[in-house]
Amino acid sequence: MRYTIRPLDTATWAAFAELAERNNGVFGGCWCMACHPEVSRTDAAQNRAGKERRVRGGRAHAALVFDDSGTAQGWCQYGSPEELPGIKHKREYDKDPPPPPDWRITCFFVDKKHRGQGIARAALEGALDQIAHLGGGLVEAISEVTAGREAQGRFLFSATVELFEQNGFTRARQVGKHAWIMSRVIEPT
């Protein structure tokens, strides 16, 4: 299947919101706010409103993946470290921080009925393309190794090390039992 990638912005907000609502606000109401500073751990409506404010204010970035019918089926969130200060394994990360990235990739989501169809790959490739158009630079992600083990999908909201490696990222440092800081420089276009 061919996918269309579009940035998350005011024109695509309704499609993003429909995908999130179709999936219980994503992970029970996160709305892909967990890495933003104003996340609520208990109020899905607050997260939805916060995400919409960020999108309408140009302070949220994501590559949305649309299927042939024009329905959003997944995304990859990215942004500056200031936009996305909340990261997995932060305590271990801060013990020996890598060079400051220009961009962070923090979150993937794929509709439950469409997993295993290449949507996360399309989302990552779309995010990297959008980053290149925004000036490129050092891109960082913290992801999970899945080779040789069975990983629960709910823990793979930051995708897999293998997917990042297939897209030119290298492992910088291990920060959790299966978690690695991944990095790659993206040239501007």
Locate predicted features.
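Aromatic- and Gly/Pro-rich amphipathic surface segment
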Residues: 25-57
